[in-house]
Amino acid sequence: MITSLATTAPTQFLDVSGTRFAYRRFGIPAGIPLVFTQHFMGNLDNFDPAISDALARGREVILFDNAGVGRSTGTAPHTIAGMAADAGSFIDGLGLRSADLLGHSMGGEIAQLIALDRPDLVRRLVLVGTGPPRR
């Protein structure tokens, strides 16, 4: 049986403005972390562990459930802008000054809006199979 950091790292919880975000941190906790933003109908268990584990060999990786998704509480926003705002609040709640964002599909739209709305928070974007963001 193959074990994965993405699935064996403990799920933690962070309370931010009435939302309890579920997340996992793993890899090398030095430097700027890589935060994965969710694709449509996804949660922190839906990212390919082969990819997240490979990236975690050289840096810290953070997977999370956005508001109202998976193990996180709150109400899932009905807009990409709302999802981006919640994701930005989560990143702020972790106390990160800067992060690299990896977004696939809808997660790419979320990541782009965070970068547009909060350029101070985003160092780099990795966009996979996504298009321009919808507000």
Report each predicted region and the residues it spans:
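N-terminal cap/lid segment of alpha/beta-hydrolase-fold proteins
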Residues: 2-20
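Alpha-helical elements of Rossmann-like donor-binding domains used by nucleotide-donor carbohydrate transfer enzymes
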Residues: 9, 46, 50, 82-89
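Conserved HGGG/HGGXW glycine-rich cap/lid loop of the alpha/beta-hydrolase fold
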Residues: 16-73
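Flexible, active-site-proximal loop/turn residues at the rims of small-molecule/cofactor binding pockets
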Residues: 41, 46, 76, 81, ...
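Short, well-ordered alpha-helices that flank and scaffold nucleotide-derived cofactor binding pockets
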Residues: 53, 57, 89, 116-120
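Active-site loop/oxyanion-hole signature of alpha/beta-hydrolase fold enzymes
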Residues: 62-102
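Conserved hydrolase catalytic core segment
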Residues: 97-135
